[in-house]
Amino acid sequence: MVQIVISSTGAEGLAEWVLMELQGEIEARYSTGLAGNLLGDLHYTTEGIPVLIVGHHILYGKTIHLEKPFAVLVKHTPGKQDCDEPGRGTGTQYLVTALIKNKILFKTRPKPIITNVPKKV
C-alpha cells in the first residue's frame, strides 16, 4: 500500500492534506526515488470521481471521509540558542502543521491508456 499526501489550505488556517491510498507499488523510472518528483495528474469527473493518470495508466478512485482525522506534527527540540531565552522550557515541542480529514482510495488495478496505434499495411 502506497500513501501519498496532497496539500491544500483549510478553513482553520491550518493546511488540509488529503491522503491518497494506492494498492501495489510505484517504482521510479530512474533510481533517484519518488521524493520531490511529479507522480501524475489528479482530476475529478463531473460526478466527483477522482481520476489519477500516472504515465500511460489511469486509475479511478473514491473519496472517503476519515472517522478520526490525522494531525501532521513537526517536532521542535530546543537547541542551545533556544535555552538562553527566559521563560522557555527545555522540553520538546510538537507543532501541528496540517490536518488530514479525507483520503482518496484507488483500489482497482490501473488501466492502460491506449492511443491510436497505426496499423501497418
Curated annotation (Swiss-Prot):
Pfam families: Ctf8. InterPro entries: Ctf8 (IPR018607). It is found in: Nucleus. One of its GO terms (cellular component) is Ctf18 RFC-like complex. The keyword Protein biosynthesis does not apply. GO terms for molecular function: DNA binding; DNA clamp loader activity; single-stranded DNA helicase activity. The keyword Transport does not apply. Disulfide bonds: none annotated. Keywords: Cell cycle, DNA replication, DNA-binding, Nucleus. One of its GO terms (biological process) is mitotic sister chromatid cohesion. Belongs to the CTF8 family. Component of the CTF18-RFC complex, which consists of CTF18, CTF8, DSCC1, RFC2, RFC3, RFC4 and RFC5. The CTF18-RFC complex does not interact with the Rad9/Rad1/Hus1 complex. The CTF18-RFC complex interacts with POLH. CTF18/CTF8/DSCC1 associate with PCNA. CTF8 exists as a dimer with DSCC1. Chromosome cohesion factor involved in sister chromatid cohesion and fidelity of chromosome transmission. Component of one of the cell nuclear antigen loader complexes, CTF18-replication factor C (CTF18-RFC), which consists of CTF18, CTF8, DSCC1, RFC2, RFC3, RFC4 and RFC5. The CTF18-RFC complex binds to single-stranded and primed DNAs and has weak ATPase activity that is stimulated the presence of primed DNA, replication protein A (RPA) and proliferating cell nuclear antigen (PCNA). The CTF18-RFC complex catalyzes the ATP-dependent loading of PCNA onto primed and gapped DNA. This is Chromosome transmission fidelity protein 8 homolog. It comes from Mus musculus (Mouse). The gene is Chtf8.
